[in-house]
Amino acid sequence: MGARDCTPLLMLSFLLFPLGFPVLGAPARLICDSRVLERYILEAREAENATMGCAEGCSFNENITVPDTKVNFYAWKRMEVQQQALEVWQGLALLSEAILRGQALLANASQPCEALRLHVDKAVSGLRSLTSLLRALGAQKEAISLPDATPSAAPLRAFTVDALSKLFRIYSNFLRGKLTLYTGEACRRGDR
């Protein structure tokens, strides 16, 4: 076996060698890197700031239902993990519906602003990514495992907004509040 015959075998072994090592930053743990969530929070804040002074084209011709982002820290700490997961999962689903509805309303506006459309598109993409990351973390399984008969399983609190700036404020607050609290605790448990 000459040197040329060994080259393909050597190259193949170099390609397969890394497969024996655990992947750092695998998707299930990616949400545990604080920089990942901080990036989504920054995008949400930028969208919120961009729409704060906006009057023209930022109001909706209908109300959009969004999750309540207020957190009672005393109650949150005493909540079962499954209840926290359910609240975050339902809130994320409702927020995704709201952003998608806002996107549709913006697309149907007479003169949609391209910058606003870009922020909404980023929010849609960000929420899809966050949903995937939470699914990999096990939030959906924890939320589903909560028995329906549990008395602590209160319905998700929600209200309506009528402007893009309010929608982005809710988006930003949800990421900084309930989502950050849940992912922080889920990552600390380390059993994922």
From Swiss-Prot:
Disulfide bonds join 32-187, 54-58. It is found in: Secreted. Produced by kidney or liver of adult mammals and by liver of fetal or neonatal mammals. GO terms for molecular function: cytokine activity; erythropoietin receptor binding; hormone activity; protein kinase activator activity. Its main location: secreted. Glycans are attached at residues 49, 63, 108. Keywords: Disulfide bond, Erythrocyte maturation, Glycoprotein, Hormone, Secreted, Signal. Coiled coil: none annotated. GO terms for biological process: cell surface receptor signaling pathway via STAT; cellular hyperosmotic response; embryo implantation; erythrocyte differentiation; erythrocyte maturation; erythropoietin-mediated signaling pathway; hemoglobin biosynthetic process; myeloid cell apoptotic process. The keyword Disulfide bond applies. Residues 1-25 form the signal peptide. Pfam families: EPO_TPO. InterPro entries: 4_helix_cytokine-like_core (IPR009079), EPO/TPO_CS (IPR019767), EPO_TPO (IPR001323), Erythroptn (IPR003013). Belongs to the EPO/TPO family. Hormone involved in the regulation of erythrocyte proliferation and differentiation and the maintenance of a physiological level of circulating erythrocyte mass. Binds to EPOR leading to EPOR dimerization and JAK2 activation thereby activating specific downstream effectors, including STAT1 and STAT3. This is Erythropoietin.
